[in-house]
């Protein structure tokens, strides 16, 4: 008898287009019963711009709406939202905003047993779709199992209004799939770790798709952002299929997490991932110059100075990256890089 299995939870509804925020009520009602209570989790800036539009659309569909404003993405905040959802018997928790709001809503909905709806206002990373959440307060800065969204509602017009830097960070996060899949294959060969070809191919397709449209994305056109968003959704779905973050997160993400620990000035997640991908592509013997060229095309950082971090911080991050998730085998090996090897890698690739 074949006993190996894993569960795949996928979104029921994915909508990407112009003006869809004002139609969100119809999409949310498709995954919730009429009269359901929808708790919108959002930050102060985003909620002041978009909450009233979202509420009007939800209430037009007979849904009751509440707002929970958060200021950080910590376990404590997420647990607070979960308690409120449980005590008030809230059926739907919607994340409106960037990574913080979506990660908190995602985690809280799992804890409360509520339906989760993802409504991103920036295209900064693929967490808009994935069933994993990144929160501060755990022992290590890694993604934890949460809940896949039942519905994803992405208004391209809203995304286009976001600071360009955040959307370009999403490009960096997607470029990281090139090395993430290489690391996954390596772990399969050397550690007999489960490897799913379909999930890996889907993640790679996301990276290849935005690579082909790099110039359009650089221009910040609606079409360019639509391609970026669809690729982020696709990458998130690859994690749903794999049942882990493996197809989307490898050594380049370990570097990014490590850099966030050691750097005084914190770059955006996708920015750090992009720079990490340059170096990890070199270690894999791949065309790291092409990776750097793609990042330059869209205006993403390619070195420490552009990231706003110190050279020594990059080197230190490289030396501790393998210890962020010791159970996750990557090109960095079990013990990671020595300081000498880390500095040589960063210099060879022009990161420092």
Curated annotation (Swiss-Prot):
Residues annotated for substrate binding in this entry: 126, 173, 257
Regulation: Totally inhibited by EDTA in vitro.
A Pfam family the protein falls into: Fe-ADH_2
One GO cellular component term noted in the UniProt record for this chain: cytoplasm
Temperature optimum or stability note: Optimum temperature is 94-96 degrees Celsius. Over 96 degrees Celsius, the activity decreases dramatically. Hyperthermostable. The half-life of activity is 30 minutes at 95 degrees Celsius and increases to 2 hours at 90 degrees Celsius.
Protein name: Glycerol-1-phosphate dehydrogenase [NAD(P)+]
Keywords assigned by UniProt, alphabetized: Cytoplasm, Lipid biosynthesis, Lipid metabolism, Metal-binding, NAD, NADP, Oxidoreductase, Phospholipid biosynthesis, Phospholipid metabolism, Zinc
Signal peptide: none
Phenotypic consequence of residue 173 to N: Decrease in activity and in affinity for substrates and zinc ion. Loss of activity and zinc binding
One of the record's GO molecular function terms: glycerol-1-phosphate dehydrogenase (NAD+) activity
Organism, as annotated: Aeropyrum pernix (strain ATCC 700893 / DSM 11879 / JCM 9820 / NBRC 100138 / K1)
Main localization category: cytoplasm
Record flagged with keyword Transmembrane: no
Phenotype when changing residue 253 to A: Decrease in activity and in affinity for substrates. Loss of activity and zinc binding
Residues annotated to bind NAD(+): 99-103, 121-124, 130
Note: Catalysis proceeds by an orered bi-bi kinetic mechanism.
PANTHER family the UniProt entry points to: GLYCEROL DEHYDROGENASE (PTHR43616), GLYCEROL DEHYDROGENASE 1 (PTHR43616:SF5)
Biological process terms in GO annotation: glycerophospholipid metabolic process; phospholipid biosynthetic process
Documented effect of changing residue 269 to A: Decrease in activity and in zinc ion affinity
Record's subcellular location: Cytoplasm
Pathway given in the UniProt record: Membrane lipid metabolism; glycerophospholipid metabolism
CC cofactor: Zn(2+)
